[in-house]
Amino acid sequence: MQIITDPAEMQKIAEKLRLQHQYIGVVMTMGALHEGHLSLVKLAKEKAGTVIMSIFVNPTQFGPDEDFHRYPRPFEKDVALARSAGIDYLFAPTTEAMYPEGYSTSIDPGPVATRFEGASRPGHFGGMATVVVKLLGITRPHLAVFGEKDAQQLAIIRRVVTDLNIGTTILGAPIARESDGLATSSRNIYLSSDERQQATALYRAILYAGEQIEQGRADLEAIAAEAEELVLSEKDTQPDYLCFVDDATFERATKAVPGKAYRLIMAVRIGSTRLIDNWRFDYQ
C-alpha cells in the first residue's frame, strides 16, 4: 500500500492507472476506521481492480458547535487497517493541501441539502459535496462507494455527480451494524456504557416500523410518531428528527403509495453524542 499526501501526486498516479486501463474504485473516509468502512472497502474490491482510500477530516462540513477538533484521528491504526483490508493507495492530504491559500470555490447541492441533516447542520452538505467533488477529481475513480447509513449524503452525492456530469458510478453499501443492531459509527466511542445501551432504541424503532409496514399499514406519519415514542422511552434521548421520506427526493412522506420507495430516517442525541440511522423499503 502506498501512502500519498500530495493531491497533484495522487492525481498523476490515478491518471497513469487509467492509461493502464485499471478500473479504479474509491472509498472516502474521515478516518477512525471501523467495520462499516471495511465493508465499503470489501464492496469496492469486489467491483474494482485498484482501490484508493482517502482519509481527510474535512473542516468545511463541521458546524461551529460540532466536534471537528474532538473527532478521533488514530492515523497509525487507520493505516494498519487500510493495509490489512487490501487498499492499494491511501490518500491522506492535509487541510492546507486541500484548501490552499486563495481557495474560494464551493458547491451548493440545492434544496435537499436544507432538510433534516441540512437543517440541523447548516452548511454541512455544501462542505461535504465540495470535498467529494475535489476527491473525485483527484482520485479519478470509475466507481465510488458510500455507506447507506448517511442516506441523505448518498442522495446528494448522486444528485451532484449526475448534475455535474462527473461520470463516476456511485454505489451505496448496506449499513454495517453491531450485534445488537446499533449502526457502526466513529462517534459510538463517545457513548458511555449506559448511553450505549440507550442507543439500541434507534434500531428497535426501525424494527417496530418494519413490523408495522409488514402488516400493511400505510400511515407513515403515525408509525413514525409511535417509533419516536419508543426512542423517547429511553432516558436522555432527544430526537432531532424521526420521520419517513421519499427515498428519491428526501421530501417528508406521510402516507405510503404502492410501488414507491421510502426511508425511515432519524437523528437522535444521546447525552452529548448525535447518532443517525435509517431504513429503506419498497412499499407493495
From Swiss-Prot:
GO MF term list: ATP binding; pantoate-beta-alanine ligase activity
Record EC number: 6.3.2.1
GO BP term, example: pantothenate biosynthetic process
GO cellular component, one term: cytosol
Catalyzed chemical reaction(s): (R)-pantoate + beta-alanine + ATP = (R)-pantothenate + AMP + diphosphate + H(+)
One Pfam family this sequence matches: Pantoate_ligase
Gene3D superfamilies (UniProt xref): HUPs (3.40.50.620), Pantoate-beta-alanine ligase, C-terminal domain (3.30.1300.10)
Residue sites binding beta-alanine per the record: 61
CDD domains for this protein: PanC
Domain of life the protein comes from: Bacteria
Localization (cell): Cytoplasm
This protein's UniProt keywords: ATP-binding, Cytoplasm, Ligase, Nucleotide-binding, Pantothenate biosynthesis
InterPro entries membership: Cyt_trans-like (IPR004821), Pantoate_ligase (IPR003721), Pantoate_ligase_C (IPR042176), Rossmann-like_a/b/a_fold (IPR014729)
The keyword Aminoacyl-tRNA synthetase belongs to this UniProt entry's keyword annotation: no
Annotated ATP binding sites: 30-37, 147-150, 176, 184-187
Pathway listed: Cofactor biosynthesis; (R)-pantothenate biosynthesis; (R)-pantothenate from (R)-pantoate and beta-alanine: step 1/1
Its biological purpose: Catalyzes the condensation of pantoate with beta-alanine in an ATP-dependent reaction via a pantoyl-adenylate intermediate.
More info: The reaction proceeds by a bi uni uni bi ping pong mechanism.
Family the UniProt entry places it in: Belongs to the pantothenate synthetase family.
Protein name: Pantothenate synthetase
Species this chain originates from: Chlorobaculum parvum (strain DSM 263 / NCIMB 8327) (Chlorobium vibrioforme subsp. thiosulfatophilum)
Taxonomic lineage from the root: Bacteria, Pseudomonadati, Chlorobiota, Chlorobiia, Chlorobiales
